Amino acid sequence: MKFNYKILHNYGNFLAVLKEIIFNVCEVREMSNDQTRAPVYEALEKLRRKRVVPFDVPGHKRGRGNPELVELLGEKCVGIDVNSMKPLDNLCHPVSVIRDAEELAARAFGAENAFLMVGGTTSAVQAMILSNCKRGDKIILPRNVHKSAINALVLCGAIPVYVNPEVNHQLGISLGMNLESVRKAVKENPDAVAVLVNNPTYYGICSDICSIVKLAHEHGMKVLADEAHGTHLYFQPQLPVSAMAAGADMAAVSMHKSGGSLTQSSILLTNKGVNADYVRQIINLTQTTSGSYLLLASLDISRRNLALRGEESFAKVMDMAE
């Protein structure tokens, strides 16, 4: 039998190419965990320096068409308020710099996946519920839930099972969900598909989310966390546990409230076992196709700031509070 050395040579070339591809992928993955980077912001700065003449939207033409806007916001601000284009990726289907920014956010927050949101945490909360609930499904949630959750129930037709939070009558504020109250709701509604938890509430009250996650998962229910006021929980170990660390399935995080990004910017986090592609489809049902790069860049820069300096910053705040 005559051995075909040409086949062996081609196979060797194939292995060499494959090795290079694997090396490059690993290198990209390693780079994607470099929290000093801000991929969206970097891409915007690169575009701005090229001084490209815009023939597309937005109509202010990076300030040239609206001098008053430039006077109000500044040349640099309006200069990076641009439309989606190849170097800047696309929020609806990210494949480059936005994808990289989302991967960095996922690692910074200890999540499996992260989605940059430009419709506020309202859109993130609604995406959580719409991803998990269909018409007629039950969802257990606190009576003092944000109205974005109620609006999501209107959209998907899910049935709320309310848990009344305890009340501090001295301060006149509602507290978190009592574990026994949640246990009772789970027992009475074993067909519920999810439990939603405020972590924390508007007043900073945290429920026992670790125990709630354990209870819900034991009964096959997903745990969704409204962390509109909980960004700081991810970056200071002396604070109460974050939803992702507690094992919740999804969390909506208002970066603009305590994370330093621009108003209306938010992040949706998912843990292992959540279908990220399906979540992306749900997000695209309601979120704009014209994502603001000002908001995206602010999320990118703020994530970097929190990852590098968040623990120290929040420690100072805690010291001042004491």
List the model feature ranges, each with a label.
Residues 5-18:
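Short hydrophobic targeting helices and cationic amphipathic motifs
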Residues 37-45, 49, 69-72, 93, ...:
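Conserved PLP-enzyme active-site core in the AAT-like
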Residues 61, 120-121:
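Short glycine-rich, polar/acidic loop-and-turn segments at beta strand-coil junctions
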